[in-house]
C-alpha cells in the first residue's frame, strides 16, 4: 500500500497532464443540489498544456508549472441546478510555434530547456528586438492567471461582436506582463490582444505588471503598476476609472525610480491606500543596454529561473503607500 506522501504525489502529478479543450458546452454530473441563488457563470483559467511534440523528435516541456500553456474554463450554473462546461486554449498559435521551433520564445518562470541553445535564444531575441520578426498573432500571447469581466479601459475589438453573459460583454485575461487578451464571454475565443500601455503614453515601454490588479468595490476603479526598463526604468502606479463619464481613463499615481525591478505578482488596496510591496525578488538583467528583451534574454540564457534567488539580505523590502485619489506618497519604508 502506498503511504500518504506517495498518494499525494500521485494525485498531484495529474496537474501536469495535458488537458484537452472542450469548445462545445457539455452537461456535467452534479452531486448534491446547487441553490438557485448561485446561478451564473464561473470563469477559471490556468495552465493546461505541459507537453508538446516538436518536429525535432523531442517533446517540449515547461520547467515550471506556471509555464504550461493556458486553458480557459467556463461553468454555466443554471437556476435549476444544471451545470454546463466548456473550455478553450488561450494560445493555440503558441503551441504551433513550439512544435515548429522546439522552444518557447516568451518569458518563463522555470529553468531554461537545455535543448534550446544559447545562439538560438540570442538570435531569436536579437531579431525580435531589431524588428526582423513580424508581430505574432494574439493567440501566441499566453495570459492565463486572472480573468476580469468588463474591465474598464478595454473593449471588444471593432471586428468582433459578442453576446452578453450575465452582463459581461468581454473578459480580460491577465498575466504578470503587459500582455493581456480580450476573450469572448460565451465561447472563450481570443478576440485580440490588449496592453495597459495602450491606455496612456506614460506607460509606453511597459514590460512587467501584476497579474492580480486591485479593484475598488465601491467605485470600480482598477489599480495596478507596470515596470519599464531602459533609460527611464522604474515602476509606474496607475488608476483606471471604473464608473462615470471618464470610465476607462488612466491616471498615473506616481513613478518609483529608486527601487530594483522585482517580481510583483499582486499589490494591496485598502479603503484609503494603494500599496506596492517591493520585495527582494529582483529580476535578473544585463549591464549592457537594459532593454526588456535583453533582460528576458539574460534570463533565458540562465540555467535558473527568472527571479534572482536567494533573497539578498543587504536589500531591504520597500512598501509604498499611495493615496488612491491623488497618488501622493503617504508613507514609504
Which stretches of residues belong to each language-model region?
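Beta-rich catalytic cores
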Residues: 68, 209, 262-263, 326
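Short beta-strand elements that form the blades of beta-propeller/WD-repeat-like
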Residues: 41-44, 57-64, 74, 168-175, ...
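Well-ordered mid-protein domain cores that form the structural environment of catalytic cofactors
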Residues: 96-246
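Long, low-complexity intrinsically disordered regions
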Residues: 223-227, 233, 237-239, 255-259, ...
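N-terminal regions that are enriched for targeting/export leaders
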Residues: 1-157
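Beta-strand elements of modular eukaryotic interaction domains
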Residues: 33, 60-64, 161-162, 171, ...
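Beta-propeller blade signature
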Residues: 70-74, 232-249, 287-333
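Beta-propeller fold detector
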Residues: 84-94, 191-198, 247-256
Amino acid at each position: 500500500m502506498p503511504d500518504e506522501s506517495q498518494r499525494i504525489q500521485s494525485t498531484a502529478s495529474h496537474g501536469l497532464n495535458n488537458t484537452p479543450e472542450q469548445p462545445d458546452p457539455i452537461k456535467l454530473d452534479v452531486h448534491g443540489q446547487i441553490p438557485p441563488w448561485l446561478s451564473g457563470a464561473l470563469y477559471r483559467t490556468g495552465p493546461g498544456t505541459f507537453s508538446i511534440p516538436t518536429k525535432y523528435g523531442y517533446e517540449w516541456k515547461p520547467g515550471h508549472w506556471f509555464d504550461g500553456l493556458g486553458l480557459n474554463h467556463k461553468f454555466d450554473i443554471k437556476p435549476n441546478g444544471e451545470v454546463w462546461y466548456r473550455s478553450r486554449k488561450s494560445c493555440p498559435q503558441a503551441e504551433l510555434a513550439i512544435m515548429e521551433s522546439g522552444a518557447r520564445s516568451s518569458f518563463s518562470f522555470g529553468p531554461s530547456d537545455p535543448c534550446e541553445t544559447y545562439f538560438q535564444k540570442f538570435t531569436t531575441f536579437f531579431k525580435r528586438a531589431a524588428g526582423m520578426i513580424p508581430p505574432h498573432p494574439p493567440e501566441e500571447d499566453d495570459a492565463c492567471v486572472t480573468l476580469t469581466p468588463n474591465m474598464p479601459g478595454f473593449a471588444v475589438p471593432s471586428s468582433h461582436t459578442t453576446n452578453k453573459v450575465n452582463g459581461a460583454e468581454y473578459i480580460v485575461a491577465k498575466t504578470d506582463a503587459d500582455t493581456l487578451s480580450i476573450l469572448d464571454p460565451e465561447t472563450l475565443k481570443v478576440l485580440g490582444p490588449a496592453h495597459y500601455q495602450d491606455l496612456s503614453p506614460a506607460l509606453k515601454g511597459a514590460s512587467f505588471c501584476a497579474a492580480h490588479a486591485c479593484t475598488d468595490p465601491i467605485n470600480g476603479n482598477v489599480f495596478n503598476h507596470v515596470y519599464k526598463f531602459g533609460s527611464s526604468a522604474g515602476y509606474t502606479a496607475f488608476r483606471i476609472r471604473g464608473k462615470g463619464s471618464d470610465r476607462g481613463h488612466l491616471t498615473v499615481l506616481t513613478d518609483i525610480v529608486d527601487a530594483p525591478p522585482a517580481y510583483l505578482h499582486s499589490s494591496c488596496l485598502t479603503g484609503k491606500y494603494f500599496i506596492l510591496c517591493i520585495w527582494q525578488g529582483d529580476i535578473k538583467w544585463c549591464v549592457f543596454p537594459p532593454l526588456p528583451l535583453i533582460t528576458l534574454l539574460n534570463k533565458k540564457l540562465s540555467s535558473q529561473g527568472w527571479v534572482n534567488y536567494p533573497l539578498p539580505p543587504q536589500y531591504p523590502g520597500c512598501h509604498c503607500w499611495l493615496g488612491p485619489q491623488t497618488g501622493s506618497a503617504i508613507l514609504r519604508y
